[in-house]
Every structure is written in structure tokens, then in C-alpha cells.
From Swiss-Prot:
Subcellular location, principal: cytoplasm
Subcellular localization, as worded in the UniProt entry: Cytoplasm
Superkingdom of the source species: Bacteria
Reactions mediated catalytically: adenosine(1518)/adenosine(1519) in 16S rRNA + 4 S-adenosyl-L-methionine = N(6)-dimethyladenosine(1518)/N(6)-dimethyladenosine(1519) in 16S rRNA + 4 S-adenosyl-L-homocysteine + 4 H(+)
Gene3D superfamilies linked: Ribosomal RNA adenine dimethylase-like, domain 2, Vaccinia Virus protein VP39
Role noted for this protein: Specifically dimethylates two adjacent adenosines (A1518 and A1519) in the loop of a conserved hairpin near the 3'-end of 16S rRNA in the 30S particle. May play a critical role in biogenesis of 30S subunits.
One Gene Ontology molecular-function label: RNA binding
SUPFAM superfamilies assigned: S-adenosyl-L-methionine-dependent methyltransferases
Source organism of the structure: Streptococcus agalactiae serotype V (strain ATCC BAA-611 / 2603 V/R)
Enzyme Commission number(s): 2.1.1.182
Protein name: Ribosomal RNA small subunit methyltransferase A
């Protein structure tokens, strides 16, 4: 019987007297078919190390440990540590780290893998309330994670994988797709969780590009410009740029010049710009002295 089997999950929770904490966004998956699909989507085998975030009682960890070389699972809730020691006792290739992933020194931690030179994949059922900070923290880290296969809120998955000229497209799409390809693999209904969340989830697969999708003079400024363009989605690019950078005649003249260099119409909205468009705009703004 699998940990994710509903009767087994309930028995584990009762045996340990565990109660869910809303502050940790805990929703445990109880569908073994979906867990197998996650492992298949991530293409986990013995030539790969895995980092898992929020293992809960070990439902996904069990599947990962059977397929991966090693699994390092970060769990912030110390009440779950003895439960994981119980449920994962048969595995000698799992390390459970009782730490907030955002505070972990991952560069040091991954040296604890028996073979730290193997490709590392991130496979996780991420808490909804902190999905974006965790993803951006890991993507922007200096660790070359090969890919991410994460279960997140469907709406966030749609935003991350969105293309220009769509309602979901925004600065988050750009921030992730600058580094990674992103595609929704399949939808997970809310009914397969204990307790059931209020929304459906999606499995998002992100694969790191060999290099960023565009070359820019200043990455921080590029991301800043992309955020500025979406501050007021219904406003034109010109309105958002002048609201942020200023409305003096000198500034407006520089903005006009930058848009001209980048060959972008001031009357369009941010959602119409592709990532290469934003790269051209950011570099042009730098060129004119903004």
C-alpha cells in the first residue's frame, strides 16, 4: 500500500495526531496515478538527484526515492520530521532537511549528495502561498538545476507559461521564461487532496535554457522594465513608462527616443510585447540615459 492511498494517509495522520496548519499551506495528495505521472513527466531515473520541497508525509517522496539516485527533501514543519522518518524508513537514499528552502544554503547542501555531480531536478508540490518566491529563488540561484516539475495553483502555472497577447501574460511569464522553457503538462483536480484546496492545480514542467532567451545589457533593469509595463495592465506602455520614470519634458524626450530605437509604438500595452521586445526596450532606455 502506498503512502498516498487515502486509507494509509488517514492512518498515518491519526497515528501521529497530526493536524493541518493553514500557515504552511498543507494539502496532501492522495492519488497514486497522479504521483506516477509526476515522476514520468520529470523523467526521473538513477542518473538524477532530486530536490523536493514540502514533502508532507512522503507521498511523492516515496515515488521519487524509488526512481532517483537520491532525494533531498526540505520540510519547514518540524512536526512532520518524525512522520517522515517513519514513512520513509525503508529508503537509504532520502535526506530530510528540516529547513525553510528560502533560507537554505543550497550550494552547501547539495554537496551532501553521495554524487553531487549528477544532474539535479526540482520536483515538488509547492505551497500556494509562497510558490512564486520559491520558484524565483531557485531559478535565480547559481545552481544549474536541469529542470523543475512542480505542482502549483493552475492560475499561476498559466501565468508562468503564458505567451504575449494573452490575459495571463505578465512580468512573471517573462521572469521565468527568460531562464526556462515552461509548459503545463496536466491539470490536477482539487478533489484528490486532503484537505481539498479551493482551486485546481497544474503540473508545470520548466527546463533550463542553455543560456537566457535574450541577451541584455543589465538584467536587473530588464526585469524592472518588464514589471513597469504591467503595473496598470489596461494602460498603454507610454502611460506606465511615464508614471514610473517621470513626466518631465527631458524624460519624455528620452522615452520617445528609446521607443523609437526599439521600434515599439508607445500606444501599445505591455501584454503585446515579447521578451525580445522588452530586451530591446530595456537596452534602448539604457542607451538614452534613463
Amino acid at each position: 500500500m502506498r503512502i498516498a492511498d487515502k486509507t494509509v494517509t488517514r492512518a498515518i495522520l491519526e497515528r501521529h495526531g497530526f493536524t493541518f496548519k493553514k500557515s504552511f499551506g498543507q494539502n496532501f495528495l492522495t492519488d497514486t496515478n497522479i504521483l506516477q505521472k509526476i515522476v514520468d513527466t520529470a523523467e526521473i531515473d538513477k542518473g538524477v538527484n532530486v530536490i523536493e520541497i514540502g514533502p508532507g508525509i512522503g507521498a511523492l517522496t516515496e515515488f521519487l526515492a524509488e526512481n532517483a539516485a537520491e532525494v533531498m527533501a526540505f520540510e519547514i514543519d518540524d512536526r512532520l520530521i518524525p512522520i517522515l522518518a517513519d514513512t520513509l524508513a525503508r529508503f537509504d537514499n532520502v535526506q530530510v532537511v528540516n529547513q525553510d528552502i528560502l533560507k537554505a544554503d543550497l550550494q552547501t547542501q547539495i554537496q551532501a549528495f553521495k554524487n553531487p555531480d549528477l544532474p539535479i531536478k526540482v520536483v515538488a508540490n509547492l505551497p500556494y502561498y509562497i510558490t512564486t518566491p520559491i520558484l524565483m529563488h531557485l531559478i535565480e540561484s547559481k545552481i544549474p538545476f536541469a529542470e523543475f516539475v512542480v505542482m502549483i495553483q493552475k492560475e499561476v502555472a498559466d501565468r508562468i507559461s503564458a505567451m504575449p497577447n494573452t490575459k495571463a501574460y505578465g512580468s512573471l511569464s517573462i521572469a521565468v521564461q527568460y531562464y526556462m522553457t515552461a509548459k503545463v503538462s496536466f491539470i490536477v483536480p482539487r478533489t484528490v487532496f486532503v484537505p481539498a484546496p479551493n482551486v485546481d492545480s497544474a503540473i508545470l514542467k520548466m527546463v533550463r535554457r542553455d543560456q537566457p532567451v535574450v541577451s541584455v545589457q543589465d538584467e536587473d533593469f530588464f526585469f524592472r522594465v518588464s514589471k513597469v509595463a504591467f503595473v496598470h495592465r489596461r494602460k498603454t506602455l507610454w502611460n506606465n513608462l511615464t508614471s514610473h520614470f517621470g513626466k518631465s519634458e527631458d524624460t519624455k524626450a528620452k522615452l520617445e527616443k528609446a521607443l523609437e530605437i526599439a521600434k515599439i509604438k508607445p500606444s501599445i500595452r505591455g501584454e503585446a510585447l515579447s521578451i525580445p521586445d522588452f530586451a530591446s526596450l530595456a537596452d534602448a532606455l539604457k542607451e538614452v540615459g534613463i
